[in-house]
């Protein structure tokens, strides 16, 4: 994971001919000066238990109006700013008179894994539920149990629906079964609710396992392009234009892949990708025994694959005219991705076209009409912290909010930049304050960013699937970086001594030629 993050955060989207994506040095420090304003869209839990009836919900007027502590929690302007870990855990647990705000539930379940394992949190929650509400007492007031049981079930339902991957841990499932058994005993209504929640969770985990198996199968079937070339004559090699010559159709199929892979990324993966040892924890790293961010990593690897596929398709053709045609085709595909709101595929295509083996093909580029490509590069220009892209992303997000069709709902962010933003938020602000309190102000902002992603990933792709095109995009052999350079030199010869030396070296090592 450390190597993965180093590679991801250390790369740069350069001028033509330089190496990948963006420099982290240009990233400004991310503070929390604007948190209160930004959090207006995130309703928060009232700072003390609020009485509500079965249908009336919260009394929204019962807020503290000044800075003060409340049972280990610190508020400012009605916003929860910090608190001890134990107080925050208690704040998560419903009582007869109180149910935590959904925003607080999501934020705490997301961020708590920086301090303790999810199974440890579940154990504490179960203990508080049983102990505080006397669920273990056979003489417990049944009316009281009937009041608290729906709220505990609702909390567990929100946990299993939003963070289902936590329950791949057998310890989580054990605690869940023990608590739900106490709640459902003797009440047929609660027993059905527990059964429905459990079945939904199992379906999600089964689907995840099937997705991971399919992904592993796809990855194992991918071979190096150069190896294929050695065994098959180039004349019978398939290329992208023989599979699909319509830019709009290809952009739609790319969007299918993007949305499918986005949908399997759990919100917790953004936190677990950067998790470090809590200074107040004497135990080992919380996630040393977890698959921390495998779906997130797989999605970043898809970006890299698409970039290399684009470069491979451009460098493959022998004829200059054909190479120019492929470049213009991908420019049109990139433009359609932009129109759809698929910024990740757009950036992957631009990255592939800016790789040195492609950008050095000057005779080929001379035959290309680059006006549309220049506009797309301008939209994704990394200067001013990707200002142009962020403006376009806000426009796509607004379009999604007011959408009249499923197509208008699509927002697929440039994913590596999203990860980078979250990384710098995490690195720029301490998890704990000097007094040992959890810095919850930081986690409101973290949750805000991840919540936006959660909205984007739930969109269903409205386009028809083309299995042949999808299969090609996912499994077509691609060149390695060295093979790309070799293909580039074979297409347009070396221009200086350094390139000549590299060409000879590559021919010797890759083709066993001198």
Swiss-Prot record:
Start and end residues of each Ras-GEF domain: 246-494
CDD domains the UniProt entry points to: RasGEF (cd00155), REM (cd06224)
Keywords from the UniProt entry: Guanine-nucleotide releasing factor
Keyword Aminoacyl-tRNA synthetase: no
Domain N-terminal Ras-GEF: 76-206
Superkingdom of this protein's organism: Eukaryota
BP-aspect Gene Ontology terms: Ras protein signal transduction
SUPFAM superfamilies to which the protein is assigned, alphabetical: Ras GEF
Tissue: Detected in oocytes, and in embryos at 4 to 120 hours post-fertilization (hpf). Detected along marginal blastomeres at early epiboly stage and throughout the margin at the onset of gastrulation. At 60% epiboly, strongest expression is found in the dorsal shield region and is restricted to the epiblast. Detected in the anterior border of the presomitic mesoderm at the end of epiboly. Detected in adaxial cells, in the somites and in the nervous system during somitogenesis.
GO cellular component labels: plasma membrane
SMART domains linked to this entry: RasGEF, RasGEFN
Cited Pfam families: RasGEF (PF00617), RasGEF_N (PF00618)
InterPro entries: Ras-like_GEF, Ras-like_Gua-exchang_fac_N, Ras_G-nucl-exch_fac_CS, Ras_GEF_dom_sf, RASGEF_cat_dom, RASGEF_cat_dom_sf
GO molecular function: guanyl-nucleotide exchange factor activity
Keyword Lipid biosynthesis part of the UniProt annotation: no
Free-text function comment from the UniProt entry: Guanine nucleotide exchange factor (GEF) for Ras family proteins (in vitro).
UniProt protein name: Ras-GEF domain-containing family member 1B-A
Gene: rasgef1ba
């Amino acid at each position: 994971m450390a190597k993965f993050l180093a590679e991801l955060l250390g790369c740069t989207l350069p001028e033509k001919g330089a190496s990948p994506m963006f420099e982290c040095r240009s990233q400004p420090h991310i503070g929390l000066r604007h948190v209160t304003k930004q959090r207006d869209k995130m309703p928060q839990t009232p700072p003390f238990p609020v009485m509500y009836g079965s249908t009336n919900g919260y009394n929204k007027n019962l807020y503290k109006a000044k800075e003060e502590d409340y049972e280990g929690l610190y508020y400012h302007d009605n916003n929860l700013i910090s608190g001890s870990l134990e107080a925050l855990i208690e704040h998560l647990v419903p009582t007869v008179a109180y149910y935590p705000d959904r925003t607080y539930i999501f934020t705490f379940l997301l961020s708590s894994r920086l301090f303790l394992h999810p199974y440890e949190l579940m154990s504490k929650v179960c203990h508080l539920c049983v102990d505080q509400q006397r669920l273990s007492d056979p003489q417990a007031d049944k009316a009281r149990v009937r009041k608290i049981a729906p709220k505990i079930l609702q909390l567990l339902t929100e946990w299993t629906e939003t963070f289902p991957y936590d329950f791949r841990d057998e310890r989580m499932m054990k605690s869940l079964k023990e608590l739900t058994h106490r709640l459902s005993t003797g009440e047929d209504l609660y027993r059905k609710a527990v059964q429905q929640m459990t079945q939904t969770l199992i379906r999600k985990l089964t689907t995840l396992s099937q997705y991971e198996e399919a992904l592993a199968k796809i990855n194992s079937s991918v071979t190096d392009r150069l190896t294929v070339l050695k065994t098959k004559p180039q004349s019978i090699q398939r290329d992208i234009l023989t599979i699909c010559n319509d830019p709009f159709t290809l952009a739609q199929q790319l969007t299918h892949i993007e949305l499918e892979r986005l949908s399997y990324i759990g919100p917790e993966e953004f936190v677990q990708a950067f998790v470090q040892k809590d200074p107040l924890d004497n135990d080992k790293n919380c996630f040393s025994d977890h698959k921390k961010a495998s779906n997130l990593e797989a999605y970043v690897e898809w970006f890299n694959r698409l970039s290399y596929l684009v470069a491979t398709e451009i460098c493959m053709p022998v004829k200059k005219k054909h190479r120019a045609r492929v470049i213009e085709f991908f420019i049109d595909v990139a433009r359609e991705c932009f129109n759809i709101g698929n910024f990740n595929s757009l950036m992957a295509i631009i990255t592939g076209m800016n790789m040195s083996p492609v950008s050095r093909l000057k005779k080929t580029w001379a035959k290309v009409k680059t006006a549309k490509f220049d506009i797309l590069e301008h939209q994704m220009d990394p200067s001013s912290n990707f200002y142009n892209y962020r403006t376009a992303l806000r426009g796509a997000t607004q379009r999604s909010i007011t959408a009249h069709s499923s197509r208008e709902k699509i927002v697929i962010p440039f994913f590596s930049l999203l990860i980078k933003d979250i990384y710098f938020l995490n690195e720029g602000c301490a998890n704990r304050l000097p007094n040992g309190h959890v810095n919850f102000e930081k986690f409101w902002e973290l949750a805000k960013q991840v919540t936006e992603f959660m909205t984007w990933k739930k969109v269903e792709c409205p386009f028809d699937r083309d299995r042949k095109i999808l299969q090609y995009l996912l499994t077509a052999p691609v060149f390695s970086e060295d093979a790309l350079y070799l293909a580039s030199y074979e297409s347009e010869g070396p221009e200086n001594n350094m390139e000549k030396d590299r060409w000879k070296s590559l021919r010797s090592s890759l083709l066993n030629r001198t």
